[in-house]
């Protein structure tokens, strides 16, 4: 035991900003000292309805007075309700609830492998992924992502994942072997730098899967639940996956994840093949249903798209006027990235100085992830602060070199 007065009790796995927030209201976070920040980090795309949304708060309070947790050996009506609503709104026939995106990806991977097994192809267990991907922090999902910085020191890489360069059709086709079970990708890579696969490439991947008897697995943990202006990002390309992992926005801040699949893809996931202690608990299911009450309401997606347009136009103006600071806008809807010329950490700090919270990403990108309830008027206010931050960096870095 160490001296609790001198040693911090938590793992040293986070480089935390010196900010402490006491409460939140809509798109705002308020510190212990009463300072207000516009939260365009949204818990890394989690707080889809902002902070203290009245419908979510009331739903959680009501459910907390009834049931918190039940084992999945019993029927949970709210779980069946949320599952049915997701099925009715998507390609899927079946849903498995988890507590996080990583767990949802684990379920997706197991579902794909199990499908091939019960289809008479036990040799098909490998999953093709794309360089720059991020699929979670479990041993299997860091192997799926393939990034060395997340694999270092954790022993042998879990077998069964093959990375190919981003958007490379030839490499993708060459990676397919008799052992391949499926292809896994994020429609827009989040941590990978807000790199969006072109719609035509997504359609091509769907075609390649069909031609080779493979399953298409989508990681919509960050892109899903309205973040891009449609319920799920793959809808823009008009494709239907076989399996999809979701989390983040579906809970609005409460830890919920889910793996969605067609009946065919899920046919191997029979009793005893997978399980979870907390996944699908009554508290989480109540909140998930409350989130869908709002997200599926008439006019909600239109507001997301209208706010996204305001943000895109404002950020485009900054790229035009401050090319020594930012060079490109990436992403879609309210999943936005600014490709930086200065170090992205400099822009993150400059934004924080202007009381705008943002998130870093790979490829020297800064993510802006406004809550989906952000109005065009609030977006315009935020853009004023963003411009001030960018202008200050421009003055300080008149001849910045590309990082």
Swiss-Prot record:
Oligomer status and interactors: Homodimer.
Chief localization: cytoplasm
Binding, pyridoxal 5'-phosphate: 101-102, 134, 219-222, 277
Entry protein name: Acetylornithine aminotransferase
Bound cofactor: record note: Binds 1 pyridoxal phosphate per subunit.
Keyword Cytoplasm attached: yes
Gene it is expressed from: argD
GO biological process, alphabetically ordered: L-arginine biosynthetic process
């Amino acid at each position: 035991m160490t001296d609790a007065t001198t040693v911090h009790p938590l793992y040293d796995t986070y480089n935390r900003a010196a900010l402490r927030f006491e409460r939140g209201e809509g798109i705002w976070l308020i510190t212990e000292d009463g300072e207000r920040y516009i939260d365009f980090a949204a818990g890394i795309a989690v707080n889809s309805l902002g902070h203290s949304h009245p419908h979510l708060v009331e739903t959680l309070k009501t459910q907390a007075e009834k049931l918190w947790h039940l084992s999945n050996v019993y029927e949970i009506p709210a779980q069946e309700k949320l599952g049915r609503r997701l099925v009715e709104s998507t390609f899927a026939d079946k849903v498995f609830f988890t507590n996080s995106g990583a767990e949802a990806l684990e379920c997706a991977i197991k579902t794909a492998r199990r499908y091939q097994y019960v289809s008479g192809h036990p040799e098909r267990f490998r999953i093709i992924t794309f360089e720059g991907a991020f699929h979670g922090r479990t041993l299997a999902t860091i192997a799926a992502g393939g990034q060395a910085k997340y694999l270092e020191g954790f022993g042998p890489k879990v077998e069964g994942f093959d990375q190919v360069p981003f958007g490379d059709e030839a490499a993708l086709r060459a990676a397919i072997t008799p052992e391949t079970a499926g292809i896994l990708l994020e429609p827009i890579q989040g941590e990978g730098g807000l790199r969006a696969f072109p719609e035509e490439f997504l359609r091509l991947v769907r075609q390649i899967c069909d031609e080779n008897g493979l399953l298409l697995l989508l990681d919509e943990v960050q892109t899903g639940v309205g973040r891009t202006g449609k319920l799920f990002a793959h809808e823009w390309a008009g494709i239907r996956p076989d399996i999809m992992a979701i989390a983040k926005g579906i809970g609005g801040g409460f830890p919920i994840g889910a793996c969605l699949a067609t009946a065919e893809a899920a046919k191997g996931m029979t009793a005893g093949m997978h399980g979870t202690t907390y996944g699908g608990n009554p508290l989480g299911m109540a909140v998930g249903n409350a989130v869908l009450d709002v997200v599926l309401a008439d006019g909600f997606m239109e507001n997301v798209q209208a706010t996204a347009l305001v943000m895109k136009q404002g950020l485009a103006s900054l790229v035009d006027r401050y090319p020594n600071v930012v060079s490109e806008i990436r992403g879609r809807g309210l999943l936005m990235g600014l490709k930086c010329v200065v170090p992205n950490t400099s822009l993150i700090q400059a934004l924080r100085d202007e009381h705008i919270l943002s998130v870093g990403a790979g490829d020297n990108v800064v993510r802006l992830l406004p809550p989906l309830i952000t109005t065009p008027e609030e977006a315009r206010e935020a853009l004023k602060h963003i411009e001030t931050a960018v202008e200050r960096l421009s003055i300080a870095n008149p001849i910045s070199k590309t990082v």
